[in-house]
Amino acid sequence: MKVIISNETTITEPTQEILEWCKRELVLPNPDYEKKERMGLWVGNTPRTLSLYKVNGNSVILPVGAFKFIKPILNTYDVKYEQKMAKNEPIFYDAKVNLYDYQEEAVKQMLDAGYGILQSPAGSGKTQMGIALAVKLGKKCLWLTHTQDLLKQSYDRASRYIDKSLLGTITAGKVNIGTGITFATVQTLSKQDLTQYKYMWDVVIVDECHRVAGTPTSMTQFSKVISNLACRHKYGLSATVHRADGMIKCCYMLLGEVKHIVPEEAVKDKVMQVKIEKVNTGVDIPFVALDTDGTINYTKLITSLANKVNRNDDILMHILSQPEHYHLILSDRLDQLYYLYDRLPAPIKELASVIDGKMTSKKGKAEREQAIEDMRAGKKHFLFASYKLAKEGLDIPRLDRLHLATPQKDYAVIVQSVGRIARTFEGKAQPICYDYVDNFKMAENMYKQRCRHYRKCGCYGI
């Protein structure tokens, strides 16, 4: 048996034991299939499972991260190993990236590990640590992200320490490879002929790496890119290495397990403590959210709550009562965000923006970027956005008010959302998160679940 470790791990003439392991460990239930089936939708063209391995003739091909998990089995056989990794000339970045003690320790641990995931709380400086990691490795690096906003934030941060002549970007359909670090969106890179990039980079760093397993689409895009790169070092950065649908295993198989966790205590003096204020809406369970058998349809429930006029007016009252603060209003429904925005008084509306995932055109991206920049600069005070965008690294330190307009239960969403207002900023008021809780048992249970997440984030008032 022969094992070739390159962009992927190829095992020639695998035994039945190895094939059985692949079927057991590298085939995941497709959450899209399960969701459609649960909602009674047609599932004809949706695969029931997602496979992380391939069979090619007498060989089985696995993601590189899976090698560690299967190695104990390989060790019981006579195996010949061969490595075919990228080996480019060293890069002298001539950069001194400032780090706190806990960041120094995190970078050291990741250097020693050589691959894997760095888990660090929101506001702890993951981007700073990632850039320091790339500089200390002194190798050609690909920085991979899933949004233009994150790419710009990371590029701007790197340019503070590294000469721009060493930096490049692959985004919006344009390819400009840097001699040092190239910042790329997975959407653009996945559309390229990836065979030409197989040995281009020695290091890949995936920002917000839990998004690798975000959806079957994003999993396919990230998997396609990462599995085509023969990088010796594959790293991931994330505040929440967690997914409610169990898809996080995909992330481990592509990048490796969590190698270092920055404890919450280490960053307590670097982030602000968020106060949680429960706001009882008095809204009973909507009849339209019940299926014929009396069970609650979650999708219908969220839509109905988002459309409740009296509920939205209550949220609007809380928003308008503090116009001097900097508000982030989050919802699962764009209709609700626009309803709230449209009912702002004219002078207040001039200080507000709505951003959503549909702003993908050149003009839309520019408007979204401008809205975020205006919030950063203090020119605007109200930002309406989806929970999804809040998970995608909204870096606006002056935010001090958070409104959860629709109920959430996912740990990663809560942690990321609260983290948006926990950043330190000169002259910033005590950050407050307003949690709007409705008047029925399921809503109260979801609030109790959120309270557990809040406590893990160091919040108080609960």
What residue spans do the PLM features occupy?
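Conserved helicase ATPase core of P-loop NTP-dependent helicases/translocases
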Residues: 152, 166-178, 328, 338-339, ...
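Conserved RecA-like P-loop NTPase helicase motor core
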Residues: 357-457
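Walker A/P-loop
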Residues: 113-137, 142
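Post-DEXD/H (motif II) to motif III coupling segment of the RecA-like Helicase ATP-binding lobe
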Residues: 210-277, 454
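Conserved interdomain hinge at the start of the Helicase C-terminal
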Residues: 293-343
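Conserved pre-motif I regulatory segment
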Residues: 54-55, 73-76, 80-119
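Conserved nucleic-acid-binding Ia/Ib motif block in the N-terminal RecA-like helicase ATPase lobe
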Residues: 135, 139-191
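Conserved helix/coil segment N-terminal to the catalytic DExD/H
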Residues: 171-203, 214-223, 389
